[in-house]
Amino acid sequence: MRDEVAEKEKADINVTLVFQGYENTPIMVCVDGIVFSKPDLVTCLEQRKKPWSMKHPGLTQHNIVHTGDKPYKCKDCGKIFKWSSNLTIHQRIHSGEKPYKCEECGKAFKQSSKLNEHMRAHTGEKFYKCEECGKAFKHPSGLTLHKRIHTGENPYKFEECDKAFYWVLSFTKHMIIHRGEKPYKYQECGKAFKWSSNLTIHKRIHTGEKPCKCEECGKACKQSLGLTIQKRIHTEEKPYKCEECGSSNLTIYKKIHAGEKPYNCEKCGKAFYCSSNLIQNNIVHAEEKHYKCQECGKAFKKSLDLNVHKIIHSGEKPYRYEECGKITHSGEESYKCEECGKGFYCSSSLTKHMIVHTEEKLYKCEECGKAFKWSSELTIHQRIRTEEKPYKCEECVRVFKHSSKLNEHKRNHTGEKPYKCEACGKAF
């Protein structure tokens, strides 16, 4: 009898201890990896039963967290998920369904959370503020990335070159550069790209689409970057200024002052400050001619050469700028020099022109020490020593030291006469 009383008192003490532990817990309680509602748990303990012998609606869902089970499988690709909601979102990739639509602009999304994030673009709300510097962000991911600037954290490390990144997208892009993959291919011309964004922009060369339109002057651009640059012409904004020389072309001039040329050609070993210059150089080596004239079938390596060729068929006589070869139909010189007022059709020409007003000669020949204001002058100077003639005529295989001489020579084949006498109308 005494043993029974002692056993009961011991059980009462255990239950009391359990109640003391759970009296401040929320309505759902997790014990040894299993979830119980608090009222059911209390009832169970009062009856001296083991809690984990009970069942409750919702326990199965929570227990997946502990078991790692993925019971929801996609019929299209076989991918498995823990939650039915994740499977539903995933299936929209296959179906293309975007049920969440923005009432402001009509843009649609697969997930409601993405719509909520997008809405901040219209409202301008920035809920997420950095405690270090006070900068605010629309999305928590933006704040997380920004904080790494202060902490110096670079969690994404590439093992092949030990380079580390604070952003997973930068890491992914860097990995693709190492692997040399070009998964995005355009079926029309066969050209392949590393990034889907580059493929989208390239498609617009073929379609002529220019979706980014300036509200100020109506000028249309193929990509948003062009529109941003165009807007700065109207606002006269120059957000990026070089501390060394005051030039607004910050990235390029930083590399010029540092002597850094990170873009190397694998064919000829030439190095460049800008990736765009490397691309132009690669076209010289390439045999492919992706740009084809629909009128006569003639193909060209550069889109610019195709545009110039089209003028022969159209009879159009637009304004062509000699320095960069770009064509404008308005003749408007949008880029003005603040020093002398001279106008230019393109920003790169204005940047080059600004060196005229400085005495600085950044480009030095390593062989003889002679310095030049322009990289093109140094290149031409170096060809005197090497006798290199990289510009080859595709029609008759004549070679030239300078691209301008090749362009002049091409007119013998095309019959183009861009220089017209205003007095008699004769063209040359």
From Swiss-Prot:
GO terms for molecular function: DNA-binding transcription factor activity, RNA polymerase II-specific; RNA polymerase II cis-regulatory region sequence-specific DNA binding; zinc ion binding. Pfam families: zf-C2H2. InterPro entries: KRAB, Znf_C2H2_sf, Znf_C2H2_type. Gene3D superfamilies: Classic Zinc Finger. Residues 1-64 form the KRAB domain. It is found in: Nucleus. A zinc finger (C2H2-type) spans 72-94, 100-122, 128-150, 156-178, 184-206, 212-234, 263-285, 291-313, 335-357, 363-385, 391-413. Its main location: nucleus. Keywords: DNA-binding, Metal-binding, Nucleus, Repeat, Transcription, Transcription regulation, Zinc, Zinc-finger. It comes from the Eukaryota. The keyword Nucleotide-binding does not apply. GO terms for biological process: regulation of transcription by RNA polymerase II. GO terms for cellular component: nucleus. May be involved in transcriptional regulation. Belongs to the krueppel C2H2-type zinc-finger protein family. This is Putative zinc finger protein 355P. The lineage of its organism: Eukaryota, Metazoa, Chordata, Craniata, Vertebrata.
